[in-house]
Amino acid sequence: MSNTPLPFRATHDLDIVLCVESLTAEFGKKFWEFIHLGGYQMQEKSDGTRKFYRFRNPSSMAYPDMIELFARKPDVFGEKELQGLTPIPLPDDISSLSAILLNDDYYSMMLANKVTWEGISLLTPEALIVLKAKAWMDLSDRKERGEHVDSKDVKKHRNDVLRLSAMISPDMQMKLPEVVMNEMAVFLHRLTVTRNDLDQLGIRRKPDEIIQLLSGLFGK
């Protein structure tokens, strides 16, 4: 980020993906140790087939205020521990990223576009653009259906796509699964960018340059 023209923007949360291929019973043990040490007073799980877990209100301020997990491999957390969680309906306000990564095509895209920086695995800017674009479409559709969706969240994902575009070179192109590539084509059709939008975000590129850049990135 320090090598890009983007201004620094602090985040309120961290989106962390646990790769199922690397999870072990030992990880599950360490995870529950973390939850118990944090003294999380509210421990919940979804009562449907999609496995969602939420931990809130830790007794120590040194621990995250809330942890949300969408598990593709729930058995790693241990059946005995999971039985003690309070069943809840699948929340409407779950992380859009969590829901997206239940899709095998998006999950494989993520795995193919991760890099290591100082020992930490991160997603490339172009992969983040794909996830942000998908999240923007999903939240926009839910809002149109009358579901409770914060307009600020919808706008944030769209603005993040525009900000991240400043980190993409014109000759960059991704190899995407067909399903993902087709959905990115839909995103481009729905996306509108004005000069005022870019000025507010401090982006110097022209609106048509952004569209062309994203079209080339997605192979469209």
Say what each PLM segment does.
Residues 1-220:
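Compositionally biased terminal segments of proteins
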